[in-house]
A protein has these predicted regions:
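The beta1-alpha1 cofactor-binding region of Rossmann-like NAD(H)/NADP(H)-dependent oxidoreductases
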Residues: 63-74, 106
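Substrate-binding pocket helix/loop in short-chain dehydrogenase/reductase
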Residues: 100-101, 105-110
């Protein structure tokens, strides 16, 4: 019998209470990993951890707000207290600020960066000691919005371009320590991202703004992501439409710009 791909590994996942984060947790656990789940909504984490344990996996739920200094370090302390050291850190937590530039305030941009950029930094800095000692992996969940910036999502795109740059820089710095850095850039994945407002508050009844035929399930996306992580790939654009958009913008940006001029500004239609 083949050994599960991540057997014996411990994986820290931020933003694990829903969407891509929860799907990654289930898939890592199914492939033999111990998962440390971090997010603000502890009750959801505990329910997910219980689900994973019932299925025969190992999971630790930790309340964490990545915008608060010291919170990611406390998660690492909780993991150590449970006898766990982090092999793979997945900086997944994030949300999207949407709106035309003239309608947004500096505070909106600061709020966006505090979670999507500085939250990623806090997460990686907290886990890096373990990951480096175990020659593990750093995984950053970016977006196709880190490859192409459209009207109406300047703040979100700026944050995703920033973490894409971080991934490229870290890869060169950590290579000599045997640490891989994988940047995942999803397209439209079914998640709660588009139910979160510009202040980072979740609205359960907010409508989905992406047509169903464009959405890929979080479970399917997670399986693709795990293959990239297991192979220690540099970067993986997830979803077929995501790869197409990135490719066409790289080779024919004029075509994308022409289509954008015909349409409306993007409003919550983000990864």
């Amino acid at each position: 019998m083949n050994r599960p791909a991540f057997a014996g590994r411990t994986v820290l996942i931020t933003g694990a209470s829903s969407g891509i984060g929860a799907a990654l947790a289930r898939e890592f656990a199914a492939q033999g990993a111990r998962v440390v789940l971090a997010a603000r909504r502890l009750e959801r984490l505990e329910a997910l951890a219980a689900e994973i344990r019932i299925a025969g996996g190992q999971a630790l739920a930790c309340c964490c707000d990545i915008t608060r200094a010291g919170d990611p370090e406390r998660v690492i302390d909780q993991a150590h207290a449970a006898g766990l050291s982090i092999d793979i850190v997945v900086a997944n937590a994030g949300f999207a600020v949407a709106g035309r530039f003239e309608k947004l305030t500096l505070a909106d941009y600061q709020c966006q960066f505090d979670t999507n950029v500085f939250g990623v930094l806090r997460t990686i800095q907290a886990a890096l000691g373990d990951v480096r000692a175990r020659r593990g992996s750093v995984v950053i969940i970016g977006s196709i919005s880190g490859h192409i910036s459209l009207p109406g999502i300047s703040a979100y795109s700026m944050s995703k371009f920033a973490v894409r740059a971080l991934a490229h820089a870290l890869r060169g710095e950590l290579r000599r320590h045997g640490v891989s850095v994988t940047l995942i850039s999803p397209g439209f994945v079914a998640s709660q991202l588009r139910q979160i407002d510009n202040a980072g508050r979740w609205h359960a009844n907010a409508p989905e703004t992406v047509p169903p035929w464009l959405l890929v399930s979080a479970a399917r996306a997670a399986r693709t992501m795990l293959r990239a992580i297991h192979r220690r790939q540099r970067e993986r654009v997830v979803t077929g439409h995501g790869r197409f958009i990135v490719w066409i913008y790289r080779h024919a940006p004029w075509l994308v710009n022409a289509v954008v001029r015909l349409g409306r500004p993007v409003r919550r239609v983000v990864r």
